[in-house]
């Protein structure tokens, strides 16, 4: 069983979080008074206490919240937990939604140390059940259920739709097919993200890597970008 070692918040984005020792987590929103709370999949950020201590041993002058993490948890290698894992602490229930993130190379820790552990060690979660959380509270890991729905991301590629010159009809059509399949074939899908991109290769590559590595979705569906125009590069990006 793990333990909460710090509860960190910041009221403004771009500022270091401070350990407030206890806070209220709000369902489907995040930590009360924290700048990163909101209706998105990265409501709460977490780091392993042991990984922070290893980094400190290299001479890093850091305090709780220096990496922008909300919760510091001991007893678990958090990055090894798959997306979909749930973390229970008292009445609070979180679900892991992302592993790692892109680093802002200009952060203060990176400037000093030439390294930052948040991109490879940090994880993110949504609040399924809210409540109070405090330093010293126990944390229990609940592994993902085998019969949970397949997680899906839908990506539409269209220069005109991205520019607002045309409605995206393909993405919603794919969502409808998935919902109809649930009723017909009894296969459950959970659409995690719907993304509209301009045509081209690099933007799609970045999203495919993020969705596969960080979000760990089971299925990525793309539509558009398969014609003969120079910017129709969906097959090339996927390969």
Predicted feature locations:
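Electropositive, beta-rich accessory/interaction domains or terminal extensions
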Residues: 1-93, 98-100, 132
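Short, Lys/Arg- and Gly-enriched loop/turn segments at beta-strand edges
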Residues: 95-98, 102-106, 144-150
